[in-house]
Amino acid sequence: MKSDKFYEFLLSAFKNMAEHLEKGGAAYVFHADTEGLNFRKAFVDAGFHLSGCCIWVKNSIVLGRSDYQWQHEPVLYGFLQNGKHYWSKTAGRSQTTIWNFDKPKKNQNHPTSKPLDLLAYPIVNSSMENAIVIDTFGGSGSTLMTCEKTNRICYTMELDEKYASVILRRYVEDTGNADNVFVIRNGDKIPYSALVKEVEDGDEKNE
């Protein structure tokens, strides 16, 4: 995707996020540093105040073609300019922009899967228990799982059918609760157990 098209894509996504956040709602955006300019511009143009950029320092490098191998990931931090943002009293003023968390040894679920303790750090700092957290790029469902563990409510979405399935499977495996998991397809409410059977039956036919 060309740079200008990518900017428009980000701007549209961030505007949709902004429309569904409460006044002063905080936002964190993990992103690739090579696209930092587009991310920052779209973030600000969508109505967010860019308060700072935190750095996730990983315990090992991510091999690539760059002369310098990447061992960090930037995280934009900001909030809507239409109200006062929430900051946890327990967080105080001792938090820093450097976040040292080990990256997953294997990313079987998603190539950029985040560890839950990493995501819990900003979520706890910027939201109260039972608050709603939105993630419009669900990926492997790490934000959903983190909210489950920190007593938050997560609204997430994922356009890729493969990773939407990963999110469902991961949630059921981690919580052990499939009874309340379902998919609405063409107006029909389909239980998770029926979806699993549908996949298994399809696999048997392909053998």
Question: What are these regions, as identified by a protein language model?
Answer:
Residues 168-207:
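S-adenosyl-L-methionine
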Residues 1-164:
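Core catalytic lobe of class I
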